């Protein structure tokens, strides 16, 4: 690759080609100016508003006082002139200078667009002119002279007389229309008089007199630079005797750019107000520059390229591509027809540079380095260029003739003389005589050299002719380009409206194109020069036929193979550039065929490239213009289709990705009329999406006026003139309404929608995010500069290689210093083209880091501070160790070794930087003195340094201990605050997680999703993992038993016994754990022991159906290893029970599901606490070992040396304080369980419990949040499942199949029993959610699988069978009545309380009782067989209800005869009418019954399980 030269073109085409440049660079420059002035402008506006009100009233009075003071100074100046002997001319100069200062203000203010503040001119006190009295007569108008007071009025009369004479002689005054020069030319005689005045004696007399007479001087508070014209006489050269003539103003041959005059010349400055400090003079403010830009922009609103060209000039000057005179010439040429703008540009020029306007409307440019000259207008410049071209053509014709006569030579010499004469006129020097004398002194011996000179001139003329032809071609090309400029600008606006970033790509293409053309021109010139050089060499070889020694250096000619290699390399570069140029053009004009075609017409060389280029280039452009998606187009004939193999598919795919449309598969067809006579249309391009659709959508929804305003607003946003918020706020004003469709479209493009679904990246119809203008967040000045830097780099990037390497345009490769000649293979791997630039991906301003919490911020800050302190202490100790070793070695040396021993600059330490840093920390600025002393006397110096270091070590160690305590206390406070916040968050989360509805909905939702998707997946809906620790299961049961006392709806201890029995036996069996033995004591002395015997199922069923009043108490016996009951049946049953422990299957309803979920939550927390205790215990043991080693003295030797005992004690105490060694936490888990049991027994409140647990497990306090509510929820659901007296009881159903499952010897038998068990559960639990639970203990990782079977409504036939059952109840209900009827009548009305439900103990039956109470009294008797209780059975019921206490009760074992006798009892036959309604009817029919009978009915209603 090559580095293209800077600049877009060459020759005289720069001005015309500037009109075609896009406004991207100009916009970036203006953006940079606005960004730099933003903060300064705001600050100045605030100060100006505050001071404006205070100064406004005083300003008028101060101005009048200043004028009066100025007039007094002028009068005093004129009065003091009579003290000095000088001629009337000097007096006139002083008078003219004073009057010119007054007229200068208004004249400068009128010619400038920037508001100028007129003030009084001031003379700097430090100016050399103030100390040289002779210089006062030559001061410019803006520096008033200071002279002593006049003694009398004689000088005033002389001045008045002289003024009258001069007016009579029509001497021009300073207040005339034409401004008088600041320093007039002094005649020769008068100049000599002034020079004589500078003699030493006169100067001493004047200075002595000046010291005697008080002089009124003006005090200044600012620095005003002295103009370079007014130098002191002492520094000026001697005045020549010749009278200098005013040099004529010669027009400049090139357009110039002026510089500004100092502020004093533009109208002076204000005098200092009393009590107000004046700001120093500085460069033009940013607001002035912005105001000047606004005036230019508004003036040339119809001719926008002028404004853009002005910004490009300013950018070139800022990049130091052009100098100050070039800027002035170009600006004057650009703004030639606007004098107020040209003169206003003086505001921004340096001191000494100025543009003035002559009466004939010509601009004169003056600068300190050159004489004033007239700036040409654009027409004059073009005329001169044409004239210069014509002269060059004439010279070529003359040089091509065979003979050159002497007259023609004389003509050429005359022309040279005229040119030199004009040049002398420009410089103000008349050298005609010198030139004539130089020509006459030529010798005849130089005729041969003259002939050679003429030959070289002819060759140069030939080159000029070629350059002239090139310039004419460029002029013609520029005229053609000007015809298409407006068209290409309109196409650019339309094409890049919705994607302004593409404008940068187009700009890059234009620059690359112009650079490529310039490179080709340069290469063509080089070829021509080489050919001319070859011709000259051949001619010289022919002339030099005479043999002889030659001292001329001979050029070494390159071999032919090297020339061929260079030519092939250049040809390869041109071809690659052409290919890359076409690719850039295609990438810029993606989706814009009209713009692509207009660009080809707009750039003539591009058309030549397509015509003269390779077939691949031409085919590439043609396929871009005429390619159509032929895969899904049947309406295009095969003849007109393009072969896909000839198409650049990568480019087409890229074009497809970057488009947008209103629909995903929409196609945009662009057609143009064919060239044939038939008039058929030719499809240029067929795309699925296009940016034109966005413009069409806006155009269809707006009026032309609204669309115009909208385009202006969008362009302002794209140029970063307004923010996104301002754009959004202006949309309703343009549309007239709020919430219109157009407003919604623009909001989607800007990404202003709050809903994620409405964002553009989620909308298939919206513009792709990468083509949208970036959302500009509020950035500071630093971020804005970074953004501008990124944009500049992106604009200058031609292509990239990886994320960081870029090929930049206008970048010259820097020559590597020290590189030697290498082989071609080695040179190929060197990088001379690519520039490494950061990608800024990791510094993206749109992304923000996660905000740290207060605890994290404190941790970071504390760790940094502790690290710094530790580095200081450790570095000091390291230096002490090294210097101590050096001192010990020195003391052990002999006298001879001591004399030869020397210390280096770092005291022989291993780490130089550490030693210097520590010594500088301890001794500050005296460190080097101590080092020098130690080098002179090592023994004394090292001892003194070690004493200081050890003293600092003790001081810093104490400080470290104090800071460690402070940091630890602060960390504890921060940790406590953070823990409190975290606990509150977890409490809110746990309160929602403990509710039954979310837990049930969780598994129901999974089942519903599978059902909707018709999934055949049979995997579990939910899997819960358990801990393998056996102890945790028993601990959960122990703690749960203490949370039953406060349950609503419980019946004292009778329900608690059933709950304990379920928890210790059934639940543990479900979880494949060994159940604990439970012993139940009845009121008659019977004892039920549950330890895994054959009758355990029957006993469990009996106790669950038994009235709790008969239970005296229960005891949980630990698992016994004694052999008290070793019957064969018990052993056989126990073996089966333990063999099947690895897998359990059972069914349940919502209550069982909630029991499993709550039990799993508690078990998981207990397992976490137990593992944390193990970690704490291990840490405690490790700390004890370390502390023991420390006490034994292993850690006392720091850095391999023995420290003092006092230091050891302090370090040991500091380490103990930091480690904060606690007692052994092995009992923390047991202590927590005791605290939980006290909490369950209401012996402790939740606040005291949290404080106690916080000391035991400070990092796991969140595990105990809402622990009381979690246990209460578990106890409530266990109570509801075990004490429910309904037929659909899943626990009773499990006990029915439990023994059959345990006795199954084969897996097939067990599966059949489980299948039957599941079918029965689905029938019994119909109308509720049925869950299947399967607990598996596998490889010491137990888990439970849960399936849910959605609820089904009961059929009407099933309800009729239950209500019309004439035979009464089934066998299970009869057993329930038998077991529940024993011993009734003790607690009376307490039996009416139903078991608690899962909905916080709400009793629905009580509500039915209240609703049915009034209607039940008036309900007629039912004579059908659905509601009567036969009276002949009352005695049976009475005898049954009131059996004597000595009646035999059920023992642990029942014989077959007892079961048959029990089943033969004739129970009362009642219908399935609701229980409370039967009770009320019986009371109504038998009002005369005694109390015992009524009580019997009440207890009967409580025992018989009716629906």
From Swiss-Prot:
Q: Give the compositionally biased regions (Basic residues).
A: 270-279
Tissue specificity of this protein: Expressed in all ray structural cells including ray 6, 7, 8 and 9 of the male tail. Also expressed in the inner labial neurons, socket cells, the cephalic neurons in the head and the ventral nerve cord.
Q: Where is the composition biased (Acidic residues)?
A: 427-438, 1354-1365, 1373-1382, 1389-1421
Q: Which GO terms describe its biological process?
A: cell fate specification; defense response to other organism; locomotion; negative regulation of transcription by RNA polymerase II; nematode male tail mating organ morphogenesis; response to endoplasmic reticulum stress; vulval development
Gene3D superfamilies given in the database record: Paired amphipathic helix
Q: Which UniProt keywords apply?
A: Nucleus, Repressor
Q: Name one GO cellular component term.
A: chromatin
Tell me any Pfam family this protein matches. Answer: Sin3_corepress
As for subcellular location, the record says:
Nucleus
Composition bias type Polar residues, residue spans:
16-26
Q: Name the residue ranges with Basic and acidic residues bias.
A: 439-450, 555-568
Q: Which InterPro entries match?
A: HDAC_interact_dom, PAH, PAH_sf, Sin3-like, Sin3_C
| GO MF annotation list | transcription corepressor activity
The knockout note for this entry states: Uncoordinated movement, protruding vulva and ray fusion defects in the male tail. RNAi-mediated knockdown results in sterility. RNAi-mediated knockdown in a him-8 mutant background results in no deposition of dimethylated 'Lys-9' of histone H3 (H3K9me2) on asynapsed chromosome pairs.
Q: Per the record, which residues fall in region Disordered?
A: 1-26, 228-286, 397-450, 543-569, 1349-1434
Instruction: Provide the PAH domain boundaries.
Output: 282-352
Which domain of life does the protein's organism represent? Eukaryota
What is this protein's function per UniProt?
Probable transcriptional repressor required for the deposition of dimethylated 'Lys-9' of histone H3 (H3K9me2) on asynapsed chromosome pairs (both autosomes and sex chromosomes) during meiosis, but this does not seem to solely affect the transcriptional status. Plays a role in ray fusion and patterning in the male tail, and this may be through activity of the histone deacetylase complex (HDAC).
Outline the subunit composition: Component of the SIN3S complex, which contains at least sin-3, hda-1, athp-1 and mrg-1. Interacts with ztf-11; the interaction is weak. Interacts with cfp-1.
**Stated name of the protein:** Paired amphipathic helix protein sin-3
């Amino acid at each position: 690759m090559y580095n293209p030269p800077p600049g877009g073109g060459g020759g005289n085409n720069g001005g015309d080609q500037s009109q075609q440049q896009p406004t991207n660079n100009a916009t970036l420059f203006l953006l940079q100016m606005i960004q730099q002035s933003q903060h300064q402008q705001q600050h100045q506006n605030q100060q100006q508003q505050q001071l404006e009100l205070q100064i406004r009233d005083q300003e008028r009075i101060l101005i009048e006082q200043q004028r009066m003071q100025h007039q007094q100074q002028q009068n005093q100046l004129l009065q003091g002139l009579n003290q000095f002997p000088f001629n009337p001319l000097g007096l006139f100069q002083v008078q003219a200078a004073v009057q010119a200062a007054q007229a200068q203000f208004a004249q400068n203010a009128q010619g400038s667009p920037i508001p100028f503040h007129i003030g009084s001119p001031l003379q700097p006190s430090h100016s050399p002119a103030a100390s040289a009295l002779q210089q006062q007569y030559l001061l410019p108008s803006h520096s008033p002279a200071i002279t002593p007071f006049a003694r009398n009025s004689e000088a005033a009369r002389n001045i008045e007389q002289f003024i009258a004479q001069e007016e009579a002689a029509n001497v021009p005054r300073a207040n005339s229309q034409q401004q008088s020069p600041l320093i007039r030319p002094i005649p020769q005689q008068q100049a000599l008089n002034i020079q004589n005045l500078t003699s030493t004696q006169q100067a001493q007399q004047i200075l002595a007199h000046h010291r005697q007479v008080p002089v009124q001087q003006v005090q200044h508070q600012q620095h005003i630079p002295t103009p370079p014209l007014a130098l002191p006489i002492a520094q000026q050269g001697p005045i020549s005797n010749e009278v200098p003539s005013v040099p004529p103003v010669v027009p400049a041959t090139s357009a110039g750019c002026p510089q500004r005059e100092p502020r004093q010349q533009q109208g002076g400055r204000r005098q200092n107000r009393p009590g107000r400090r004046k700001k120093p003079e500085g460069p033009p403010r940013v607001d002035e520059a912005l105001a000047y830009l606004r005036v230019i922009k508004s003036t040339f609103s119809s001719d926008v390229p002028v404004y853009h060209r002005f910004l490009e000039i300013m950018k070139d000057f800022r990049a130091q591509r052009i100098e100050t005179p070039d800027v002035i010439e170009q600006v004057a040429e650009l703004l030639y027809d606007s004098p107020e703008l040209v003169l206003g540009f003086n505001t921004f020029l340096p001191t000494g540079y100025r543009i003035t306007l002559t009466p004939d409307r010509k601009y004169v440019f003056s600068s300190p380095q050159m004489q004033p000259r007239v700036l040409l207008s654009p027409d004059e410049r073009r005329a001169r260029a044409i004239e210069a071209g014509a002269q060059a053509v004439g010279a070529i014709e003359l040089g091509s003739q065979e003979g050159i006569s002497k007259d023609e030579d004389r003509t050429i010499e005359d022309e040279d003389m005229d040119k030199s004469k004009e040049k002398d006129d420009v410089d103000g020097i008349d050298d005609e005589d010198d030139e004539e004398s130089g020509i006459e002194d030529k010798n005849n011996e130089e005729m041969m050299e003259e002939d050679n000179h003429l030959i070289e001139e002819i060759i140069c003329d030939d080159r000029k002719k070629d350059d002239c032809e090139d310039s004419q071609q460029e002029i013609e090309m520029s005229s053609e380009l000007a015809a298409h400029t407006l068209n290409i600008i309109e196409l650019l606006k339309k094409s890049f409206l919705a994607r302004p970033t593409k404008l940068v790509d187009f700009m890059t293409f234009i620059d690359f194109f112009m650079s490529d053309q310039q490179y080709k021109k340069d290469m063509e010139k080089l070829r021509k020069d080489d050919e001319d050089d070859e011709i000259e060499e051949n001619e010289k070889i022919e002339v030099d036929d005479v043999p002889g020694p030659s001292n001329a250096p001979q050029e070494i000619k390159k071999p032919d193979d090297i020339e061929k290699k260079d030519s092939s390399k250049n040809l390869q570069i041109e071809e690659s550039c052409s290919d890359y140029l076409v690719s850039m053009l295609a990438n810029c004009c993606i989706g814009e065929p009209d713009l692509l075609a207009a660009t080809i017409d707009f750039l003539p060389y591009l058309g030549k490239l397509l015509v003269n280029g390779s077939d691949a280039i031409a085919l590439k452009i043609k396929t871009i213009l005429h390619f159509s998606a032929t895969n899904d187009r049947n309406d295009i004939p095969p003849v007109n289709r393009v072969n896909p193999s000839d198409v650049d598919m990568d480019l087409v795919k890229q074009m497809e990705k970057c488009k947008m449309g209103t629909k995903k598969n929409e196609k945009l067809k662009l057609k143009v009329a064919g060239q044939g006579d038939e008039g058929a249309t030719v499809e240029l391009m067929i795309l699925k999406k296009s940016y034109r659709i966005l413009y069409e959508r806006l155009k269809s929804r707006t009026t032309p006026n609204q669309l115009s305003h909208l385009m202006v607003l969008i362009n302002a946003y794209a140029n970063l003139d307004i923010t996104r918020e301002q754009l959004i706020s202006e949309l309703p004003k343009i549309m007239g309404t709020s919430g219109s469709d157009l407003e919604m479209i623009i909001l989607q493009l800007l990404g202003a929608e709050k809903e994620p679904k409405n964002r553009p990246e989620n909308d298939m119809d919206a513009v792709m995010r990468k083509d949208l203008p970036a959302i500009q967040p509020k950035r500071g000045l630093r971020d804005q500069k970074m953004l501008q830097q990124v944009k500049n780099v992106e604009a200058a990037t031609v292509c990239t290689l990886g994320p960081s390497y870029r090929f930049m345009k206008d970048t010259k490769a820097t020559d590597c210093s020290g590189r030697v000649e290498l082989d071609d293979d080695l040179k190929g791997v060197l990088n001379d083209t690519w520039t490494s630039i950061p990608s800024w991906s990791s510094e993206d301003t749109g992304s923000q880091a996660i905000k740290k919490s207060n605890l994290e911020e404190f941790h970071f800050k504390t760790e940094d501070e502790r690290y710094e302190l530790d580095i200081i202490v450790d570095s000091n100790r390291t230096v002490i160790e090294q210097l101590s070793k050096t001192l010990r070695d020195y003391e052990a040396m002999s006298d001879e070794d001591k004399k030869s021993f020397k210390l280096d600059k770092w005291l022989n330490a291993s780490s130089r930087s550490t030693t210097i840093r520590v010594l500088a920390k301890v001794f500050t600025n005296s460190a080097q003195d101590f080092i020098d002393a130690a080098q002179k006397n090592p023994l004394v110096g090292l001892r003194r340094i070690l004493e200081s270091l050890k003293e600092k070590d003790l001081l810093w160690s104490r400080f470290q201990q104090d800071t460690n305590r402070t940091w630890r206390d602060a960390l504890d406070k921060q940790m406590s605050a953070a823990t409190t916040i975290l606990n509150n968050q977890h409490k809110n989360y746990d309160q929602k997680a403990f509710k039954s509805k979310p837990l049930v909905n969780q598994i129901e939702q999974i089942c519903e999703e599978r059902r909707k998707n018709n999934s055949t997946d049979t995997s579990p809906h939910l899997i819960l993992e358990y801990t393998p620790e056996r102890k945790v299961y028993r601990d959960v049961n122990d703690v749960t038993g203490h949370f039953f006392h406060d349950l609503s709806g419980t019946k004292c201890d009778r329900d608690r016994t059933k709950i304990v029995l379920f928890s210790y036996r059934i639940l543990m069996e479900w979880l494949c754990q060994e159940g604990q033995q439970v012993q139940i004591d009845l009121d008659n002395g019977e004892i039920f022991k549950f330890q895994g015997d054959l009758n355990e199922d029957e006993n469990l069923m009996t106790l669950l159906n038994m009235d709790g009043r008969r239970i005296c108490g229960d005891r949980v016996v630990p698992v016994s290893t004694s052999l008290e009951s070793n019957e064969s049946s018990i052993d056989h049953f126990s073996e089966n029970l333990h063999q099947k422990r690895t897998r359990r299957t059972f069914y349940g309803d919502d209550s069982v599901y909630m029991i499993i979920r709550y039990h799993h939550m508690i078990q998981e927390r207990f397992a976490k606490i137990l593992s944390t205790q193990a970690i704490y215990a291990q840490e405690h043991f490790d700390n004890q070992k370390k502390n023991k080693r420390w006490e034994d003295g292993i850690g006392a030797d720091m850095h391999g040396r023995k420290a003092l005992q006092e230091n050891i004690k302090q370090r040991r105490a500091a380490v103990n304080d930091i480690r904060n060694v606690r007692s052994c936490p092995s009992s923390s888990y047991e202590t927590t369980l005791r605290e939980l049991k006290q909490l369950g027994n209401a012996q402790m409140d939740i606040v005291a419990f949290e404080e106690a647990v916080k000391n035991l497990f400070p990092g796991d306090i969140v595990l105990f949040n809402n622990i009381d509510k979690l246990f209460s929820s578990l106890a409530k659901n266990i109570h509801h499942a075990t004490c429910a007296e309904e037929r659909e009881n899943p626990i009773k159903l499990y006990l029915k199949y439990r023994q059959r499952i345990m006795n199954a010897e084969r897996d097939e038998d067990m599966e059949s029993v489980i299948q039957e068990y599941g079918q029965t559960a689905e029938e019994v639990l119909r109308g509720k959610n049925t869950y299947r639970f399967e607990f598996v203990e596998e490889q010491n990782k137990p888990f439970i699988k849960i399936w849910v079977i959605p609820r089904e409504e009961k059929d009407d036939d099933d309800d009729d069978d239950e209500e019309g059952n004439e035979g009464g109840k089934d066998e299970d209900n009869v057993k329930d009545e038998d077991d529940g009827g024993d011993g009734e009548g003790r607690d009376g009305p307490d039996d009416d309380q139903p078991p608690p439900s899962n909905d916080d103990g709400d009793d629905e039956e009580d509500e039915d009782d209240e609703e049915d109470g009034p209607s039940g009294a008036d309900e007629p008797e039912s004579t059908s067989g659905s509601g009567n209780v036969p009276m002949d059975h009352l005695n049976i019921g009475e005898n049954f209800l009131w059996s004597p206490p000595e009646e035999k009760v059920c023992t642990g074992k029942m014989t077959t005869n007892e079961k048959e006798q029990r089943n033969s009892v004739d129970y009362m036959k009642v219908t399935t009418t609701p229980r409370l309604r039967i009770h009320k009817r019986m009371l109504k029919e038998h009002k005369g019954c005694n109390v015992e009978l009524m009580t019997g009915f009440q207890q009967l209603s409580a025992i018989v399980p009716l629906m």
